[in-house]
Amino acid sequence: MDRLNVGIIGTGWCGGIRAEASAKNGLVDQLHICEIREDRLKEVADLTNPTSATLDYKDLLKNDDIHAIMISTTPESTHYPIAKETLEAGKHLLLEKPISRTLTEADELIGLAEKNKVQFTIGYSQRFRSKYAYVREKFIDGTLGEPVSVLISRNITTQLSKRITGRTRLSPAAMEATHDLDYALWCLAPRKPVRVYSQQVEKVLIKNSNSADCQLSLIHI
């Protein structure tokens, strides 16, 4: 199997993890990283010994040696424009959630990937947890029988809430529950949603982070 040259745009919390994992992966030949904070760029470069480290993500997009890009930037409003440039540059792309803030932008990115014949996926990490994959296997082989309903509840700590809120106005579904929705739909494929009802509560977090406290969603498949 050919080894890949990978570029990572954004090496903060999640991007830093991906950079370290890529540096240790035998399938990765060259690692290129980009981070707008010089101190963090140096910190991650010291940990990963990349082929190149830059403050400007466009340096990675112009590098013909790079096959694939991972985008892990904040605020989340940066996902769409950087992803668009990446796909237009003909690079394979792993983009952290959310894919974008509007359906129109999401459809455009998918269309660009298809047009340029490149792989494009969202970083839904739950699929790679062994216990989650095991449950899906039991859906597929019939051990669990015909699914009637799926109930998922996700709670996050106050510390994590402070870390991820306030950057962009997004619902709890877009920020966190998207992982659970992806997992449920992965298990239930090829079934598709046909109707959705959702409601959220805004009392505490809205004062400082412009985010809702909780969200309830009912999805008919």
Per-region residue spans from a language model:
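N-terminal Rossmann-like dinucleotide-binding module
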Residues: M1-T48, S72, A184
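Local beta-strand N-terminus motif with an aromatic residue
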Residues: Q30, P50, I66-I69, L144-P147, ...
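Beta-loop-alpha module in the N-terminal Rossmann-like domain of NAD(P)-dependent dehydrogenases
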Residues: T51-L112
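Structural detector of well-ordered beta-strand residues that form the stable sheet scaffold
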Residues: T54, L94, Q119-T121, L151, ...
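A contiguous active-site-proximal alpha/beta segment in oxidoreductase catalytic domains
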Residues: S100-R163, L170, D180
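Rossmann-like dinucleotide-binding domain that binds NAD(P)(H)
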Residues: L160-L218
